[in-house]
C-alpha cells in the first residue's frame, strides 16, 4: 500500500509540474487567444482520476481475472505428489524472498508458461501451466517459480499498473488538447465541441496509445531482466539459464495465455521488427546472455 501511495503522490507532483510548465510557456494564453477556454489543471486532474482508476481497478481484481481467464485451479489441498512438491517449492522460495506464501495454482495449457499476479507482494498468486509441469525437469520448474516469486518480491504487478496509470493520464490529457486545438483553431468551431473535436480526440488517443504502450512494454521488458536475476539468486544461475534455454526450444509453440496476462507470464511469445517494441518480454537469447554476463 505504501508503494501505491508514494507512486500516486509522485505522479500528482508530475501532473502539477506539467501544468505549471505549460502555463509558463504560455500554452494557456495561446489556446485562449484562439478561442479555446481550457483549464489545464482541471483537465489534468480529470484525466489522472480516470487514467489511474482503470489500472488500479485492474490491479485489485487481477487475481480473480487471472483465475477466470486462464482456468487456473488453486491447490488448497494437494492431491498428488507433484502438487505437494509444487506447494513446498513455492513456500520455500517465498520464505527465501521474504514474502508471504502466495496462492498456488495450475492452469490447463500445453505450452510451458507461468505467471504471477496480485495487488501486493503478500497477497499474490503464482500459477504454472500443465505443460510446464509435464515436460520440464524439477530444477527447471523451480527456476521458473523463482522467476515468478521474483516478480512478486519486486512488486512488479503494482509498479506496472501504476506506470500504466501514468501513461493513461497523459494520453487522455494530450488527446483532449489536440481535439480542442483541431476543433477550435483549425475548424474554427465556436459553439461547444464539434464533430472535429471527437474525431481528433479518438485518433490522437489511438496514436498516443500506441506510443504509450511502447513505453509500458519497455518497462515490462526491464522488469523481466530483474525477475531473471531474482530467479537466479533463488534457484541458481545455471538452473535459471537452463529453464530459459528450455523455453527457447519450445518457442515455436503458440502462446494461448490471454493478452491481459501475457505481460505476467515467463514466456511472452516472439515478435519481429517494429512489433518487437510492443513485446512484454525481451528475446530469450538476450535474457540468457544477461544471466551469463552476471555470472
Swiss-Prot record:
InterPro entries according to UniProt: HtpX_protease (IPR050083), Pept_M48_protease_HtpX (IPR022919), Peptidase_M48 (IPR001915)
Co-factor requirement: Zn(2+)
Molecular-function GO terms, alphabetical: metalloendopeptidase activity; zinc ion binding
Ranges in a coiled coil: none
Active-site residues from the entry: 148
Residues binding Zn(2+): 147, 151, 224
Subcellular location field: Cell inner membrane
Keywords associated with the record: Cell inner membrane, Cell membrane, Hydrolase, Membrane, Metal-binding, Metalloprotease, Protease, Transmembrane, Transmembrane helix, Zinc
One Pfam family from the record: Peptidase_M48
Cofactor details (free text): Binds 1 zinc ion per subunit.
GO CC terms: plasma membrane
Subcellular location, principal: membrane
EC number: 3.4.24.-
Enzyme class: hydrolase
Transmembrane segments annotated in the record for this chain: 4-24, 41-61, 158-178, 199-219
Protein topology in the membrane: Multi-pass membrane protein
Family that this chain belongs to: Belongs to the peptidase M48B family.
HAMAP family for the chain: Pept_M48_protease_HtpX
Entry protein name: Protease HtpX
UniProt source species: Pseudomonas putida (strain ATCC 700007 / DSM 6899 / JCM 31910 / BCRC 17059 / LMG 24140 / F1)
Source taxonomy: Bacteria, Pseudomonadati, Pseudomonadota, Gammaproteobacteria, Pseudomonadales
Primary gene name: htpX
Amino acid at each position: 500500500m505504501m508503494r501505491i501511495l508514494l507512486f500516486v503522490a509522485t505522479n500528482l507532483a508530475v501532473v502539477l509540474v506539467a501544468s505549471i510548465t505549460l502555463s509558463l510557456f504560455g500554452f494557456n494564453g495561446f489556446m485562449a487567444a484562439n478561442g479555446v477556454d481550457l483549464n489545464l489543471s482541471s483537465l489534468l486532474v480529470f484525466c489522472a482520476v480516470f487514467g489511474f482508476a482503470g489500472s488500479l481497478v485492474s490491479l485489485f481484481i487481477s487475481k480473480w481475472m487471472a483465475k477466470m481467464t486462464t482456468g487456473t485451479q488453486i491447490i488448497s489441498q494437494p492431491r498428488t505428489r507433484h502438487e505437494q512438491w509444487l506447494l513446498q517449492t513455492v513456500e520455500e522460495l517465498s520464505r527465501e524472498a521474504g514474502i508471504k506464501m502466495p496462492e498456488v495454482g495450475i492452469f490447463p495449457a500445453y505450452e510451458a508458461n507461468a505467471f504471477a499476479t496480485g495487488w501486493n507482494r503478500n497477497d499474490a498468486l503464482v500459477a504454472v501451466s500443465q505443460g510446464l509441469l509435464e515436460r520440464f525437469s524439477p530444477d527447471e520448474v523451480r527456476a521458473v517459480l523463482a522467476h515468478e516469486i521474483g516478480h512478486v518480491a519486486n512488486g512488479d504487478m503494482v509498479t506496472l499498473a501504476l506506470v500504466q496509470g501514468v501513461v493513461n493520464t497523459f494520453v487522455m490529457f494530450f488527446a483532449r488538447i489536440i481535439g480542442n486545438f483541431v476543433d477550435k483553431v483549425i475548424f474554427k468551431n465556436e459553439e461547444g465541441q464539434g464533430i472535429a473535436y471527437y474525431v481528433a480526440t479518438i485518433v490522437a488517443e489511438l496514436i498516443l496509445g500506441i506510443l504509450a504502450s511502447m513505453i509500458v512494454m519497455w518497462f515490462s521488458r526491464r522488469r523481466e531482466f530483474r525477475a531473471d536475476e531474482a530467479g537466479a539468486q533463488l534457484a541458481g544461475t545455471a538452473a535459471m539459464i537452463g529453464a530459459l534455454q528450455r523455453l527457447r526450444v519450445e518457442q515455436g509453440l503458440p502462446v494461448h495465455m490471454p493478452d491481459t496476462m501475457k505481460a505476467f507470464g515467463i514466456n511472452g511469445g516472439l515478435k519481429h521488427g517494429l512489433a518487437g517494441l510492443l513485446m512484454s518480454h525481451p528475446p530469450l537469447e538476450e535474457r540468457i546472455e544477461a544471466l551469463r554476463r552476471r555470472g
